[in-house]
């Protein structure tokens, strides 16, 4: 049976892994998941990610990050979901925690943060909020 929302599954695995103080979490790989992991790494929310073959299928390993024994990601939540897609123009993109967090946005120019999308004057689908 196929998964209805693989991105929500990815975010839940990261959230649960950090609550359990895991070093890393693994999940099935896709181009969108890799792009989201790259944004999280660039913003300093995770230590890194790698792609490995497991049983003939690619797996994405995400190395979680902690500071003083606490998870760096305090909140990670899905915004746009299969039942209710959320699209915003460049001027309407939300500011997460008044600029302290990021919104990850899928745009025609690729997956990027809300700040990069605003600077490039491009809108898109708001995938999730991270703080």
Curated annotation (Swiss-Prot):
The UniProt entry, under InterPro entries, shows:
Ribosomal_uS8, Ribosomal_uS8_CS, Ribosomal_uS8_sf
One Pfam family it belongs to:
Ribosomal_S8
Superkingdom field: Bacteria
The UniProt entry's GO CC annotations, sorted and at most eight, read: ribonucleoprotein complex; ribosome
Question: Quick check: keyword Ribonucleoprotein in the entry?
Answer: yes
Q: Which GO terms describe its biological process?
A: translation
Disulfide pairings: none
UniProt xrefs under PROSITE patterns = RIBOSOMAL_S8 (PS00053)
State whether keyword Ribonucleoprotein applies. yes
GO MF terms here are: rRNA binding; structural constituent of ribosome
**Key words, A-Z:** Ribonucleoprotein, Ribosomal protein, RNA-binding, rRNA-binding
Q: Which Gene3D superfamilies has this protein been placed in?
A: 3.30.1370.30, 3.30.1490.10
Relate the protein's function as given in its record. Answer: One of the primary rRNA binding proteins, it binds directly to 16S rRNA central domain where it helps coordinate assembly of the platform of the 30S subunit.
Q: Which family does it belong to?
A: Belongs to the universal ribosomal protein uS8 family.
Which NCBIfam families does its entry note?
PRK00136.1
Quaternary structure and interacting proteins, as annotated: Part of the 30S ribosomal subunit. Contacts proteins S5 and S12.
Q: What is this protein called?
A: Small ribosomal subunit protein uS8
Can you name the source organism? Aromatoleum aromaticum (strain DSM 19018 / LMG 30748 / EbN1)
């Amino acid at each position: 049976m196929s998964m209805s929302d693989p991105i929500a599954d990815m975010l839940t695995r990261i959230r649960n892994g950090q609550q359990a103080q895991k070093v890393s979490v693994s999940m099935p790989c896709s181009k969108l998941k890799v792009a989201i992991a790259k944004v999280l790494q660039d913003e300093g929310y995770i230590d890194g990610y790698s792609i490995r073959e497991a049983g003939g299928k690619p797996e994405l390993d995400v190395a979680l990050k902690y500071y003083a024994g606490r998870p760096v990601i305090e909140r990670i939540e899905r915004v746009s979901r299969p039942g209710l897609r959320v699209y915003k123009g460049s001027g309407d993109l939300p500011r997460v925690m008044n600029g302290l967090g990021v919104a990850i946005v899928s745009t025609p120019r690729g997956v990027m943060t809300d700040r990069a999308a605003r600077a490039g004057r491009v809108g898109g689908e708001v995938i999730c909020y991270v703080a």
